[in-house]
Amino acid sequence: LEAIIRANEVEEVWFSYSDVAHQYVMTAASRVMAAGAHFGVCSAERTMLKSTKPLVAITAVRTGVGKSQTTRYVSRILKDMGKRVVAIRHPMPYGDLAAQACQRFATYEDLDLHKCTIEEREEYEPHIDNGFIVYAGVDYEMILREAEKEADVILWDGGNNDMSFYKADLYLTLLDPHRAGHELSYYPGMVNLLLADLLIVNKMDTAPAEGVAEVIAN
C-alpha cells in the first residue's frame, strides 16, 4: 500500500470495503496518512440514489444476520397489502461486468441466462419461488430506473453490512445478539445502526439472554 502511494504520488485513498472492525479501518487510515495521502470513507447520504417509488431498505450491523429472510418477510407483507414489490439485491457480480450492468430475474431460466453463480442463485431463488422479481448487477442507477417501471414498492436487499445504495423511506437494520457489541465496533454496520428507522434484534430464539440485553442496551 505504502509503495503504491509513493510510487504514484497518490493524493487520496478511499476505503471501499465492508464488514470490518473499526480498528481495521483506522489501521489502514494510519498507514495511508503516514505514506502522505488523505484517507476517506464514503458518506451515506452522498452515495445514495433517490427512487421515485417508496423504498424500504434492509441492512444489518454484520453479515449473516438474516437480511434476505427479512426482505422476503417484508415483501410478503407488502404483497398481502396488494402492492407490487420488486427486490433489488446488493451486487455479487463475477465475470463480464459490462454484460451484467442490469439483470432482471423472474424465472429460473433467467438465472441460467445470466450464468449466475451458486452464491447468486442462493440469494435470488427464494425471491423467485415467492413470486417476486429481483434486480441486480453493476449499474445501480439503471437497475433502479428499470425496477421503478414495474413496482409500487422497492425493497433494497442489502449485502454484508453495507449501507443501502438507495435513499430509503423506511430503513431497517438487523442486530445480532450472538455477536453483541459488534453493532458499535464494525464498519459500516454502526452507520446502519445510526441510520435506522427500525431496529430488529434477530435470532432471539437461539441467542443468550445477556447478548440480547447488551444489544438492546447499546
Describe the residue ranges of each PLM region:
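Hydrophobic positions on the alpha1 helix immediately C-terminal to the Walker A/P-loop
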Residues: 69-70, 74
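Phosphate-bearing ligand-interacting subdomains
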Residues: 1-44
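A short, basic/flexible loop-to-alpha-helix module at the beginning of a structural domain
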Residues: 44-54, 142-145
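Flexible phosphate-sensing "switch/lid" loops adjacent to ATP/NTP-binding sites
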Residues: 2-8, 57-59, 76-218
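Conserved glycine(s) of the Walker
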Residues: 65-66
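Short, acidic/small-residue loops that bind anionic groups at enzyme active sites
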Residues: 33-49, 177-184
